[in-house]
Amino acid sequence: MLKIKYLLIGLSLSAMSSYSLAAAGPTLTKELALNVLSPAALDATWAPQDNLTLSNTGVSNTLVGVLTLSNTSIDTVSIASTNVSDTSKNGTVTFAHETNNSASFATTISTDNANITLDKNAGNTIVKTTNGSQLPTNLPLKFITTEGNEHLVSGNYRANITITSTIK
């Protein structure tokens, strides 16, 4: 019994001394920072060009209107025409006459913002920044006529587009 008592005391002292001999390891202090974004939001406002005529709409490089994207926390936007004939054309949006099915004119999108890239693909235009950051909160996009707009009549023209946004 006495041997067991000494054995227990010896084991206890040995455990305590090995713990007290342990050296402290390295310590690190690190600042953790993050950015909390506003909820993603997207709106678009169309402003057609005044005083369009058959002669200036029928030629290329005529400004027909400006679509201004107002957004928060958006990285890229895809603008696609819902016109079936535009799905095979790179970045084209066709405006069709409201009552005359054979009258239409094609446009493409452009911008004056040097920090914006427009990737014109079959059926859509991808709008993104050159450095991968978020789009500016207000981004005007110009709709410019293309070549081959020959069968025009006076009246109202419309184009339907789908705007899809991407967030990270």
Curated annotation (Swiss-Prot):
<protein>
    <recommendedName>
        <fullName>CS3 fimbrial subunit A</fullName>
    </recommendedName>
</protein>
<keyword id="KW-0732">Signal</keyword>
<keyword id="KW-0281">Fimbrium</keyword>
<feature type="signal peptide">
    <location>
        <begin position="1"/>
        <end position="22"/>
    </location>
</feature>
<comment type="function">
    <text>Fimbriae (also called pili), polar filaments radiating from the surface of the bacterium to a length of 0.5-1.5 micrometers and numbering 100-300 per cell, enable bacteria to colonize the epithelium of specific host organs.</text>
</comment>
<dbReference type="GO" id="GO:0009289">
    <property type="term" value="C:pilus"/>
</dbReference>
